[in-house]
Each structure stands twice: as C-alpha cells, then as structure tokens.
C-alpha cells in the first residue's frame, strides 16, 4: 500500500508538470517517500481545519518542488487542492502556483521558493511554539504542543541564511524543529561535488543540532525511526536522507536533467513502466485516497477533537488565561493596544526618534503580553529592549527580548516564522544601512501579508563620523518601491508613537520604522492621529499659500525652520510632514488635493536620501533637496552643511524656484 501511495505522489507531480510544461519533477520523485512517511506517520494536521493553531507545521523549504506539497495536500483531502487545481498547476488564477504561497492555498504554512528562507522561517515557528507553550500551557493542559517539520535540499543549505538560522536554533535548543535534508548530490548546474562538498552533518553537529543519516531514501521504516529518535533528542534535528533525484526515470534519474524540466511524454512512459504505474495521467487509485484519509485526515481530525476538548477544560480551569488563548485561536491579539495607551508629549520636547521608539515599544510591551522581538546585536543602539524582561533562551522561555546576534537576514526570516505561526506581534532591529541584509526577508513579510515591524535606526548621513558605509542613501527609495510595505520616517516623538501604534495594529502589512540617532524637537504642528493619513499639514502661515515644502523625519524640523525664515521674508508657505509615502498614496483623491493642491506648483521636497521618488509629488516645476551620491565621514553638522541640509540652503532652493 505504501509503495502505491508513494508512486501516486510521484505521478501526480510528473503529470501536472508535464501538463504545465514547466516545473521541477526531480525533487517530487526523489523526496516522495520521506514526505509520505512524514505526512502519514508524524504530522498532526486536519484538512477540515487547515488553520488549527496547534497543528504541526510543514515547510517545504525546497519550494521549487511545490508539486510534492500539492500532491500531498490533494491526497490528504484539502479542498483547495482539487484534481482540477492539480491539472491547473502554474496557471493563472490557480491554487497551485509555481511556488507555495501562504494565504493563497489552504494547507500552505509558509511561502517558499527563495532558497534558505524556508528552513530559516521554520526556526521562527519553533520559537513561537516554545514561547506560547511557556506562556499558556499549564500542568495537564498542553494547549500549544506541536512540531515544525521541514524538507530542504542542498541549495537551501548552501544559502548563508540557513547557516545563520541553524546556528541560532542550536543555541536556542529549539528541539521541536525537525529538518529532513533531501541529499541527492545534484543541483541545477550539475553535481554538488563541484560546488558543495563539506560534511553538512558535521557542521550541524557543531551548531548544537542532533543529526542522523538515512542511507536509503526509499526506506520508510528507517525514515520514521530517524524522526522518532530526533524528536526525543532534546535538540533541533537534521536528518540527512540520501535520495536519487528523479527516482524511477530510467534515463534522467540521478542527473540535473530532471531537476527543472518536465520529463516529457517518452520518459514519462518509461518511468511508468519502470515503477509499475499502470494508471492514466491524473488517475489515482481509490485505495491511495483511503490510505491518506485514514493516516492523515482521520488521524488529524481525532487529534483536533481531543485538543478542542482540552481547550474547553482549560477554560474551566484557567479562565483568565483562556480568554487570551481564545483570542489567539481566533487570530486576534489577546489585548488591544489603543492610542490612549501612549502618553501625551509636550511641544518642544527633544529626543532622537530611536529613543522615542523605545519608549513607544515599551508602552506596547506593557500592554500586550504576546509582543516580543529584538535586534541583530544592536539592541542598545536600535533601542529595541523591553525593559521589564531579560533575554529569551531555553532556560528563560518567557522573556521577550531576543538576541538574534549579527544575523540580520535570519532575524527577518525568524520573525516571519513567528508571525506566520500566529498569536504573536514581533519586531526586529538593525541599522538602516543594513536593511539590505534583511531585505529578502522583508519582501516575504510583505508578500505573505505579515505585520512584522522592522526597526531601522541611524537613518541618514547624520550618522556622521561612521561615514558612507553606515550612511543610508538609496534605502528609503528601495523599501518604498516594495508592494505592501508601510515605511514610516517619523518627524518626532509624537509621530513615532503613532507609527508604532499603526504598526502593532496592522493586520496584513509589515512596517519599517526609519529612525534617527540625533535629537529631534517635537513640533507644535505634529499630530498623532493624522499620521494615519501618511501626510498632513504641520505649518502654514497663510491660507493663500503659494509654496509647499514636503519633508520626512529629521527634515521636518529643518523645513519648518526654513518656512518660518521664508515667512519673515514675506513668503506664503505650507509645510507638509509626510511620514509615510506608502500610506499617503492610499488616500483618496480629495485628501491628496487637500494636502497638496494641484494649483500650487511651487514645491520642494526635502529628505536625506535618494531624490528619485519625490518627483511624483513636486512635479517638473518643483525641486528636491536630496542625496544622490554616497555620504562622507565627518562630524554630523559638517556633513549636513556640505550636503546642503541647512536652513540657509533650503531657503535658497525655495527662492530659486519661479
């Protein structure tokens, strides 16, 4: 029976990829046995309740092998993955896109495809489970108690981010993380002996993982036994499973020819004969469906029913905790953060927005028990520390400060995993110039609709002495170009509070907070509530103004000062703070016209970053005071003066406009 089911997985993949004339059959054919063993003997999932929060998680880090996952979901009874959807693999509007997409297809626990990010994201799942278990489980009531399983390939383990995350997972002793390594000695360009020769198991042993070897990737009992041993090891586990890529293909197995191209009609016919598969394309024997129903769907439904009974009893035994758990199960924060939680600020108060961020962050932490995060070894520079808590580790699982180490990319992927798990609000920080290191993870935050908060400090050439390697220029423009990411560059402590409030109440959009090292004065025109519009008027000296200054962040202080100087010279001027171009762009036409009247063409945008995205606001008649070269090393006042970010120069720029 098991051999028939394994071959059903293989041929669903082969047939769908042939029909699409696109895809990666090799991993489907080679990894089918380990995937079958995992689904039928280990995974607790319920196709009728795909979002059950205590389900085991499965991450196909080798996302190019998506038909392996779609075949498993179809056979297990997930309604989203019907046979018609299998036949529509990689087609417009289907539930079976080329790589797995979270939120698009029920049963997909994470978007994967960019190699290395799946295994790294899985680390976040495991850490989320550990925190929630420590927070809410009580004796006899293991409400949060599940494993995170991964299938990865050689390519995943070549990527640096997987090494970052594995080092971190070993240090944290995340013992409910089990990785099955599809070790087939082949990559897209040829054999791995030409590019990847170290002992992976030795490396993972050094990280503090349990490791094991299954020499025959078709030995279901050996795979099952290895997983059982791994679960009892007390460590994260890597099980190397030696497989043959394209198993069963007489002429292509064991070669890179089967990695990323359909088998084609002739080779498919030969493979059917070689594996004894006497069924038509997309024909699955009823006994295969029965096998998956018994060992996946029914087993999962029983586990779900037992868990719901446990939760009901928990509500009786621990009603206060149960109220928070119920919110988490429903996909809500256990406590609502409101604007009233943030203290009022006096005009004239001066503070760096990174410090204002720490104040706001701690307001959130005091209110929301499931709010946690950290920094890539810069907590006391990024100001990301929750003051009431210590560092989280295996011995201190309830602490909410996470020390990610100098692992920016892994930090982002781990945050994604924690957000995907559900039940948590998470954040992570680094210097803004190093947002490049984490950007690929930010992109998956945005693509998956995860409300992760990224805290990026030291936001401009005002860093000064550290010089151009640490002075962001192009970074704001790059992040603003990313769909479904709200970038906030607040002007002062008041706007910073508002940005944090919007970040921790966001449902489907991540947030990047771009913050200063230097002090900024709270302007009398800044407004907590208006930050939600993305842009608003902070200064105006005449109703019939004919000039608009648009600024963000530290340049709002500069723009207001310049506007007051211009006003003293008879100019009629408006200053607009635009903390988020992303949010402002989503406002209706009437609001945009209210803030930036089309009739007023004399406009200057002021920002210490690349100028390119500001012309949409100032037009061809306006000007941009920005930076389109790299920065320089000198004390900050000297750097700012040399780059023209002074009241005198801004006044001159405005005066030069017709």
From Swiss-Prot:
<feature type="binding site">
    <location>
        <position position="259"/>
    </location>
    <ligand>
        <name>substrate</name>
    </ligand>
</feature>
<dbReference type="GO" id="GO:0046872">
    <property type="term" value="F:metal ion binding"/>
</dbReference>
<feature type="site" description="Important for catalytic activity">
    <location>
        <position position="24"/>
    </location>
</feature>
<dbReference type="Pfam" id="PF00456">
    <property type="entry name" value="Transketolase_N"/>
</dbReference>
<dbReference type="InterPro" id="IPR029061">
    <property type="entry name" value="THDP-binding"/>
</dbReference>
<keyword id="KW-0479">Metal-binding</keyword>
<feature type="binding site">
    <location>
        <position position="259"/>
    </location>
    <ligand>
        <name>thiamine diphosphate</name>
    </ligand>
</feature>
<dbReference type="GO" id="GO:0006310">
    <property type="term" value="P:DNA recombination"/>
</dbReference>
<dbReference type="GO" id="GO:0004802">
    <property type="term" value="F:transketolase activity"/>
</dbReference>
<protein>
    <recommendedName>
        <fullName>Probable transketolase</fullName>
        <ecNumber>2.2.1.1</ecNumber>
    </recommendedName>
</protein>
<feature type="binding site">
    <location>
        <begin position="113"/>
        <end position="115"/>
    </location>
    <ligand>
        <name>thiamine diphosphate</name>
    </ligand>
</feature>
<feature type="binding site">
    <location>
        <position position="466"/>
    </location>
    <ligand>
        <name>substrate</name>
    </ligand>
</feature>
<feature type="binding site">
    <location>
        <position position="186"/>
    </location>
    <ligand>
        <name>Mg(2+)</name>
    </ligand>
</feature>
<comment type="similarity">
    <text>Belongs to the transketolase family.</text>
</comment>
<comment type="function">
    <text>Catalyzes the transfer of a two-carbon ketol group from a ketose donor to an aldose acceptor, via a covalent intermediate with the cofactor thiamine pyrophosphate.</text>
</comment>
<feature type="binding site">
    <location>
        <position position="517"/>
    </location>
    <ligand>
        <name>substrate</name>
    </ligand>
</feature>
<keyword id="KW-0460">Magnesium</keyword>
<feature type="site" description="Important for catalytic activity">
    <location>
        <position position="259"/>
    </location>
</feature>
<keyword id="KW-0106">Calcium</keyword>
<dbReference type="InterPro" id="IPR005474">
    <property type="entry name" value="Transketolase_N"/>
</dbReference>
<dbReference type="InterPro" id="IPR049557">
    <property type="entry name" value="Transketolase_CS"/>
</dbReference>
<dbReference type="InterPro" id="IPR009014">
    <property type="entry name" value="Transketo_C/PFOR_II"/>
</dbReference>
<feature type="active site" description="Proton donor">
    <location>
        <position position="408"/>
    </location>
</feature>
<feature type="binding site">
    <location>
        <position position="64"/>
    </location>
    <ligand>
        <name>thiamine diphosphate</name>
    </ligand>
</feature>
<comment type="subunit">
    <text>Homodimer.</text>
</comment>
<feature type="binding site">
    <location>
        <position position="381"/>
    </location>
    <ligand>
        <name>substrate</name>
    </ligand>
</feature>
<keyword id="KW-0786">Thiamine pyrophosphate</keyword>
<feature type="binding site">
    <location>
        <position position="155"/>
    </location>
    <ligand>
        <name>thiamine diphosphate</name>
    </ligand>
</feature>
<comment type="function">
    <text>Necessary for high-efficiency recombination chromosomal DNA during genetic transformation.</text>
</comment>
<keyword id="KW-0233">DNA recombination</keyword>
<dbReference type="Pfam" id="PF02779">
    <property type="entry name" value="Transket_pyr"/>
</dbReference>
<feature type="binding site">
    <location>
        <position position="154"/>
    </location>
    <ligand>
        <name>Mg(2+)</name>
    </ligand>
</feature>
<dbReference type="GO" id="GO:0006098">
    <property type="term" value="P:pentose-phosphate shunt"/>
</dbReference>
<dbReference type="GO" id="GO:0005829">
    <property type="term" value="C:cytosol"/>
</dbReference>
<feature type="binding site">
    <location>
        <position position="184"/>
    </location>
    <ligand>
        <name>thiamine diphosphate</name>
    </ligand>
</feature>
<keyword id="KW-0808">Transferase</keyword>
<feature type="binding site">
    <location>
        <position position="434"/>
    </location>
    <ligand>
        <name>thiamine diphosphate</name>
    </ligand>
</feature>
<feature type="binding site">
    <location>
        <position position="458"/>
    </location>
    <ligand>
        <name>substrate</name>
    </ligand>
</feature>
<dbReference type="InterPro" id="IPR033247">
    <property type="entry name" value="Transketolase_fam"/>
</dbReference>
<dbReference type="InterPro" id="IPR005475">
    <property type="entry name" value="Transketolase-like_Pyr-bd"/>
</dbReference>
<feature type="binding site">
    <location>
        <position position="24"/>
    </location>
    <ligand>
        <name>substrate</name>
    </ligand>
</feature>
<dbReference type="InterPro" id="IPR020826">
    <property type="entry name" value="Transketolase_BS"/>
</dbReference>
């Amino acid at each position: 029976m098991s051999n028939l089911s394994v071959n059903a997985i293989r041929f669903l993949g082969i047939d769908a990829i042939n029909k699409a004339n696109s895809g990666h059959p090799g991993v489907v054919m080679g990894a089918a046995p380990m995937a079958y063993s995992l689904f039928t003997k280990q995974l607790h999932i319920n196709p009728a309740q795909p979002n059950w929060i205590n389900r085991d998680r499965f991450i196909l880090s080798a996302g190019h092998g998506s038909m392996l996952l779609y075949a498993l979901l179809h056979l297990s009874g997930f309604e989203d993955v019907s046979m018609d959807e299998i036949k529509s693999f990689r087609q417009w509007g289907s539930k079976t896109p080329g790589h797995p997409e979270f939120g698009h297809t029920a049963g997909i626990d994470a978007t994967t495809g960019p190699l290395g990010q799946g295994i790294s994201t899985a680390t976040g799942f495991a850490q989320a489970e550990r925190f929630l278990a420590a927070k809410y489980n009580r004796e006899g009531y293991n409400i949060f108690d599940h494993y995170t399983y991964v299938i990865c390939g050689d390519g995943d383990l070549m990527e640096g981010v997987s090494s970052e995350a594995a080092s971190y997972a070993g240090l944290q002793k995340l013992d409910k993380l089990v990785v099955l390594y599809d070790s087939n000695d082949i990559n897209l360009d040829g054999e791995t002996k030409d590019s990847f020769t170290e002992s992976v198991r030795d490396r993972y042993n050094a990280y503090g993982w349990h490791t094991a070897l299954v020499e025959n990737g078709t030995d279901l009992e050996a795979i099952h036994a290895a997983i059982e041993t791994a679960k009892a090891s007390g460590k994260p586990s890597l099980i190397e499973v030696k497989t043959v890529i394209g198993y069963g293909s007489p002429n292509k197995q064991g070669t890179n020819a089967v990695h990323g191209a359909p088998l084609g009609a002739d080779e498919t016919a030969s493979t059917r004969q070689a594996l004894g598969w006497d069924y038509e394309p997309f024909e699955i024997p009823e006994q295969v469906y029965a096998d998956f129903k018994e060992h996946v769907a029914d087993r999962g439904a029983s586990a779900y029913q037992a868990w719901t009974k446990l939760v009901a009893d928990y509500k009786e035994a621990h009603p206060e905790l149960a109220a928070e758990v119920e919110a988490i199960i429903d996909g809500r924060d256990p406590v609502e953060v409101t604007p009233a939680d943030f203290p009022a600020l006096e005009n004239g108060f001066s503070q760096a927005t990174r410090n204002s961020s720490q104040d706001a962050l701690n307001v959130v932490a005091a209110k929301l028990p499931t709010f946690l995060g950290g920094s890539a070894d810069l907590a006391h520079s990024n100001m990301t520390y929750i003051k009431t808590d210590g560092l989280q580790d295996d011995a201190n699982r309830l602490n909410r400060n996470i020390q990610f180490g100098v692992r920016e990319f892994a930090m982002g992927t781990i945050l994604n995993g924690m957000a995907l798990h559900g039940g948590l609000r998470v954040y992570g920080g680094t210097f803004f110039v190093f947002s490049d290191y984490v950007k690929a993870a930010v992109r998956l935050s945005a693509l998956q609709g995860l409300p992760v908060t990224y805290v990026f400090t030291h936001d401009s050439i005002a860093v000064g002495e550290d010089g151009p390697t640490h002075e962001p220029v192009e970074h704001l423009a790059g992040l603003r170009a990313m769909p479904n990411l709200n970038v906030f560059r607040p002007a002062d402590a008041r706007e910073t509070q508002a940005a944090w409030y919007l970040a921790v109440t966001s449902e489907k959009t991540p947030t990047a907070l771009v913050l200063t090292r230097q002090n900024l004065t709270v302007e009398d025109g800044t407004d907590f509530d208006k930050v939600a519009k993305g842009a608003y008027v902070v200064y105006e000296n005449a109703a019939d103004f004919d000039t608009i200054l648009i600024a963000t962040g530290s340049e709002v202080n500069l723009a207001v000062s310049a506007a007051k100087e211009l006003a003293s010279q008879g100019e009629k001027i408006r200053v607009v703070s635009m903390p988020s171009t992303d949010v402002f762009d989503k406002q209706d036409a009437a609001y945009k016209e209210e803030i930036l009247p089309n009739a007023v063409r004399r406009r200057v945008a002021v920002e210490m970053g690349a100028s390119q995205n500001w012309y949409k606001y100032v037009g061809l008649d306006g000007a941009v005071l920005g930076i389109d070269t790299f920065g320089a090393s000198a004390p900050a006042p000297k750097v700012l003066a040399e780059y023209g970010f002074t009241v005198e120069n801004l006044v001159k720029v405005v005066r030069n406009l017709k």
